[in-house]
Design a protein with these regions (language model features):
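Alpha-helical cap/lid subdomain in secreted, periplasmic
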Residues: 70-202
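Alpha-helical protein-protein interaction elements
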Residues: 1, 8, 12, 26, ...
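Compositionally biased, intrinsically disordered low-complexity regions
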Residues: 1, 5-8, 13, 110, ...
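Serine-esterase "nucleophile elbow" of acetyl-processing enzymes
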Residues: 11-61, 65-66, 71-83
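Intrinsically disordered, low-complexity segments enriched in small/polar residues
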Residues: 2-7, 14, 51, 84, ...
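Conserved catalytic region of serine esterases and O-acyltransferases that act on ester linkages
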Residues: 1-9, 16-22, 154, 189-202
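A generic signature of intrinsically disordered, low-complexity regions enriched in glycine/proline
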Residues: 8-16, 32, 62, 98-99, ...
């Protein structure tokens, strides 16, 4: 799998920039890379494509948005703000599957983003769809993502639209999910392509 085509900078310039880039990814099993072999999740694919970046994957299976807040609070205790640190957060599917509404999920994610913003630049990942509109829950994902995009625009934050890249592939008949929630190898690869569009332009 070659993802280097997304590195569009002059090579010398990019390598100079890479040496100072720290990208820390927090989220649930979709961030961790559930349902594919080790190394084939989107974070690991990005890390392989950007070998001079320092990237960390803090994805946790089953993580809720409150769990994300708790984890971030613990992680942040001994950290100071760093200009070269980018903190990517994506979470919410597990709460939506437990019938939490969009207000609950959105407000918790904004709290998480506020905590993360005290330690670095925040990137908001837009959660992927709940495939096949299981129990009508996907509309909650769409609403949360829309509100996150509005918040990011208002506050000058970057987003990674994982939802659209998988939804569009799904709509044209590509198989990008391993089940109702988790992407398959192709899905994670598309997510990595999308993330690299942002990461290579930081």
């Amino acid at each position: 799998i070659v993802l280097y085509t997304y590195i569009l900078y002059d090579v010398d310039e990019l390598m100079y920039r890479e040496e100072f880039m720290n990208i820390i990814c927090f989220g649930d099993s979709i961030t961790r890379g559930y349902d594919v072999r080790e190394g084939l999740g989107w974070v690991e694919l990005c890390s392989a494509a950007l070998p001079a970046y320092h990237m960390e994957n803090h994805g946790i299976d089953g993580l809720s948005v409150q769990g994300l807040i708790n984890y971030l609070e613990s992680w942040c205790i001994d950290k100071s703000y760093e200009e070269n640190r980018y903190i990517c957060i994506m979470c919410g599917t597990n709460d939506i599957l437990q019938n939490r509404d969009s207000d609950y999920v959105y407000n918790k994610l904004i709290k998480a983003a506020t905590i993360a913003g005290e330690k670095g630049h925040v990137i908001l990942g837009l959660e992927t769809q709940i495939d096949s509109e299981m129990d009508g829950l996907n509309h909650v994902v769409v609403d949360v993502n829309r509100r996150l995009q509005d918040y990011a625009l208002e506050h000058g934050l970057q987003t990674i639209d994982f939802y659209t890249v998988l939804h569009e592939a799904d709509q044209i008949g590509q198989i990008v999910f391993a089940g109702e929630v988790h992407p398959n190898e192709r899905g994670y690869r598309l997510m990595a392509y999308k993330a690299l569009e942002t990461f290579t332009r930081l």
